[in-house]
Amino acid sequence: MGFSFHKVTLKKRFPLAISRGVRYDSENLFVRYEKDGYVGWGEGAPGETEGASTADEIQTVLKQFIATGIEGFSIQELYDRASEMRISPCAYAALDTAFWDWKAKKANLPLRQLLGFSRPHTPTSVTIGINSPEVVKNRVPLLLEGTTVQSLKIKLGSPQGIEADKAMFEQVVESTKTYDVKLRVDANGGWDVSQAQHMMKWLAERKVDYIEQPLKEGEEDGLKTLYNGRALPIYVDESCRFSHNIPAFAPY
C-alpha cells in the first residue's frame, strides 16, 4: 500500500467571486493510492472555511491521518474515524475518492456502477460569480453558447447588498432568455435571516429552482425561521460537512 501526493494549479476561465471573496485559480491536491497492482486517484480542493486553505495543508492533514494506521479498515470505518477526528472534509474527500476509485478498478467496474448508479451521464450546471450587470451581459453567452448545460448557478450575497444582487439577477434573466436553462442561486452565507426571507420571495417570483446556503455556517438556527413559510426549497452546503451532519436538518 502506498500513497503519493501531487499538487496541480487549475486556472479558472473567469475569476469566481462569491460572498467571501474572489478566486482566480485553485491549487488542488491529487492523491494516488496504490495497492495490489491497482491505482486509485482522488482530488481535494482547499477552502478557507473547510479546515484546509491550501494544498499543502491538505497534504499535511492526510499524512497525519494515514500515520494513525489505516490498514485493515473498511472505507466506511475510515470515513467514520475521519469524522470523529474532525479531519478537514475537503482534505478527506481526496482520500475517500482515491479509496473508492481503487475499489472500482479492482472490481473492474466503473465507479458509478460500483456505487449503484445506472446512468453514465448526469446533467450538470455552470456557475457565474458575483458581477456587475455589464459583466453578466457579456459573460452569460460565453458560459452557455455551444454547450448542453441545463442549469446556471448564480452566486449572490454581494458585499454591496441585496439591491446589487437584484440588479445582477435581473441581467442574468435577460441574458438567458434565448437559452433553455434553469436558474439556481447560491448565496454562500451572504445574507442574514431578514435579507434571505426577502430574497427568497423575490427570487421565487422569478422562477428560481432553489436557494443554496442563504445563511452563514454557524447560523443554522435561522434556517428554521426560513423554512417556515419558505418561498423556495433550501439547500445547505457549508453547513453540512459530513454525513452525520444531515440528521440535524431532518425536521426542516
What is each PLM-predicted segment?
Residues 1-50:
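Structured beta-strand/loop patches that form or line metal/cofactor-binding pockets in enzymes
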Residues 23, 88-96, 132-137:
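Glycine-rich anion/phosphate-binding loops
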Residues 31, 37, 95, 108, ...:
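Conserved, mostly hydrophobic/aromatic
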Residues 33-35, 39-106:
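Metal- or metallocofactor-binding catalytic centers and their adjacent structured scaffolds
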Residues 40, 183-185, 234-235:
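Residue-level marker for buried hydrophobic side chains located in beta-strands
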Residues 44, 97, 102, 187, ...:
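Generic detector of well-ordered alpha-helical packing
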Residues 113-230:
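Metal-dependent enolase-superfamily TIM-barrel catalytic cores that perform enediolate-based chemistry
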Residues 218-252:
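Catalytic alpha/beta core domains of metabolic enzymes, predominantly
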